[in-house]
Amino acid sequence: LLVFDPKERYTFGPVDFSGSQIREPILQNLVPFKEGEPYFSDNIAELNRRLSASGWFNSIVVTPDIVAGRKSESKQLPVHTRVSPKIKNSVETGLGYSTDVGPRGRLIWKKPWLNDSGHSLEAAGDISKLEQMLDLSYKLPLEENALEQFWMFGGGYKHEDLNDTKADSLTFAATRRWDLYEGWQKGIALKFRLDDFTQGSLDNKTMMVYPEFSLSRTRSRGGLMPKWGDSQRYTIGYANQMWGSDIDALMLEAQYTLIRTFARKHRFVLRSHLGWIETGDFNDVPPDLRYFAGGDRSIRGYDYESISPKDENGDLTGASKMITGSIEYQLRVKGKWWGAVFFDIGRADTNFEFSNLKKGAGIGVRWESPLGPIKLDIAKPVGDSEENGIQFYIGLGPEL
């Protein structure tokens, strides 16, 4: 039992680290207090959180030295921090199935630390019959605040043969990120992409160079199937022929997901997605930047990316604007099993008129597996005389 004398005020002493593969100056800059400041246990918890959030360590033990503090005339408490490195390689998987796309898989390989500066590497691959994608990213944290300030360099390749779209895309990006406050993070990126595509009957090649500004935040409580959480992301990008792009285009996007649980068994998931492209050269906009609605995480009941304007031949062209929303209610049936009902609505078009909105509704089952939520959904269009089929969706992966 540790008992503090309320008449004596303890302060923080020096912080030391043992067992770390990361250089100590980087770790010292993560310490949320200074030597000589009044001791608060919340600061010890915050140091633990920051070290955990770095992703470098498998175990963390932060211990104030009470005995040394009592013996010290200055009443300083040295803080001993013992850590053990995270394994050098980890693999994550995701699996899914839907009526329109068929089976799909995702594989992520991570190297959480490459050197004593805390650099990290991540490769992600997605594969289905209609789309194949490979992304690679390299993260360089800055010594002055490795958790909140870093550079990210990335590149990727995507092949798509879906509906009336055939495209090959090559992308590169350099991004500088900063943490702001209460979990908000801002980023400034310079992006390059080269696309060779056929959309409907139109063949094209487009190169784009553009800066992009982003603001995002993700919060969650409750493990892999959060009981409480939200995710927000807002981006604005601008391509211009003045700096080498083939087209001029202003691109705006906003995404929001909200999760709330009441009385431990009533869970609500709300989603919205808004996108806008302003350009005089829409035929030159790559399909990967155009908007198509429909499918899982969009409007369930419709084929994947099947909602879009059409040309005179009836081929999908993609849209310059999109808005979708979803509300889902889940009820805990027993243990880790949940039932679900949902309603999705939205459209992808050349304007934001709220007529002729596409709607889908359905029911589903959720299971809290050790790997994350596994879901099975059955959905169909609502009030659409041209579409009345039933779609099935099976998925494994995070909701935020």
Identify the role of each PLM range.
Residues 20, 40-233, 250, 260, ...:
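Gram-negative/organellar outer-membrane beta-barrel architecture
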Residues 174, 232-240, 247-278:
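Transmembrane beta-barrel strand/turn architecture of Gram-negative outer membrane proteins
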Residues 346-378, 382-392:
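C-terminal structured "cap/appendage" subdomains that terminate the fold
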